[in-house]
């Protein structure tokens, strides 16, 4: 007899059980991942909603103006301080928002305040709204609609303190230190588009001034003519002596002409040196001006590329919903792939079992 572990039926059963375990494990992993991703997406949505709420509150507060004001709660019909004054934080605030005035006060032990109403001098009830209700600190912030010029408010409250079995209704009057003042409107940010600086066009360099070449007057050699007195001499000279005199005068003339030519060359050389030096200095000045202008143009172009400052951009609210949609799509795709794989494995098992 063959052993049980060599039997084909036993092997197929073992394979099917192993495949069942694998499919159950993959299914549990998929379900766990879906639960985790769903919780993560909920946390992300909650965080984005919180940031949106804080941004909206900041914009609302920025549009309102406020000013602190002192007050005292006194007993009805007298100027004596009431116990109710100890259950309110000092000082209060006068707030102007959307062209409406509010007196803002913070109530301590808010759980004791079962009812509170405020009236003006004409015994007209004023609208009250709860701005913030902090259960942990047991405080409550309220806004009472007022008008500029109010000096006092009449209050009717219902206080219940269960620890001491205190349950009482009474009337007081709230006296301001000064009348409700008028407040200026909050300065709204002007959405002014930043002016983009135009790139400065480089100025065309001025035409190079040609160096003025000084005019050099040619010095003519002075030729000494023989004096008339020599011609007037009546003495006769021998022809040999006359020829000697003529040779001497010609040599003197040649010496004088060579000296004048040398002097002229000496005068012309320093003049040329001065002219060349001036032309070189002018050329250097023009090249320096060109380099400075090109540097200015490049700097202005870099500033223009950088664009306007970030301080003029308004605060943008974070984009909500995109991350949750992406997570949902990815999870659905992953789940469908896992299901298709498990179905294919089951079909394969059934074929083998047949």
UniProtKB/Swiss-Prot annotation:
Induction cue: Repressed by fur in the presence of iron.
Family affiliation: Belongs to the IsdA family.
Organism: Staphylococcus aureus
Name of the protein: Iron-regulated surface determinant protein A
GO molecular function: metal ion binding
Propeptide feature: residues: 321-354
One Pfam family this sequence matches: Gram_pos_anchor
Description of its domains: The NEAT domain is responsible for binding Fe(3+) and Fe(2+) heme and fibrinogen. The NEAT domain is an inhibitor of apolactoferrin activity, while the C-domain confers resistance to bovine lactoferricin.
Region (Disordered): 188-318
Motif LPXTG sorting signal: where in chain: 317-321
UniProt gene name: isdA
Function, in words: Cell wall-anchored surface receptor that participates in the extraction of heme from oxidized methemoglobin/metHb to enable growth on hemoglobin as a sole iron source. Receives heme from IsdB and transfers it to IsdC. Also plays a role in the inhibition of host immune response. Protects S.aureus against the bactericidal protease activity of apolactoferrin. Decreases bacterial cellular hydrophobicity, which renders S.aureus resistant to bactericidal human skin fatty acids as well as to beta-defensins and cathelicidin.
Binding partners and assembly: Monomer. Interacts with IsdC. Interacts with IsdB.
